[in-house]
Amino acid sequence: MDNLLISLLRKFEPETAHDISIKLLKFAPILFNKFRHELLEQEIVGLKFQNPVGMAAGYDKNAEVFESLFKIGFGFVECGTVTPLPQYGNPKPRVFRYIEESALINSLGFNNKGINSFLNGVQKRTDFDSPLGINIGPNKDTKNFIDDYTILINKAHDFADYITVNISSPNTENLRKLQDKTALEELISNLVASLKDKKVQKPIFIKI
C-alpha cells in the first residue's frame, strides 16, 4: 500500500503531492496503528519522547495534521515555519523532485498562513503524550527580525513543548546574518528577556 501511495503521489507536481498528503493524513488514525516500546523512549531537556524519530518543520507548516502524525507513530512533531503575518513565499515552481537521488529540494520561502491561523490549529490539541515543537521565522518584508521573533515566541510559547528559532533560511534576505556571534547574542538575549515573566520556561533551540 505504501509503494502504491508513493507512486500515485509522484504523478503530481511535488507541492501538489504535499498538499494531497496533508488532506490524506486527516484520515490517518483509520489507516495506521501506533507502535510503542520502552527501548525507543528518550528524554532530552526534560522532554519525554516515545521514540527518536520525529517529523521536522516544513511538512505541517500550518499545524493542521500534527495529531495524525503522532497517531501514526512519530516521536515528536515540529510545526512551521510560521511567521507573524500570512506569507505566500517564493514564486512557483519552488519544490523539485530528484527521484534518482531520492531527494526533494525546496525553495518555498516560509509560505504559511500566519501565527493567528496557526494557533487556531494548535489550540485544538488533545494528544500531549509526545512533544510538539513550533518553528518560528520572520516575514520576508519585515523591518526588524528581532521584533518578529519576539512577537512569535510570546504567542507560541504557551502552546509549544519547545520552540525552534529558525535563522537558517537562504530565502529570506539577510536572515543568515543573525548567525553572526554579536547578532545572535542580541537575538537570544531579547527573546529570553521577553519571556522572563513566564511561569514555565520552554526549551528554545536555534536552527542554523
What are these regions (language model features)?
Residues 1-208:
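Flavin-dependent oxidoreductase catalytic cores
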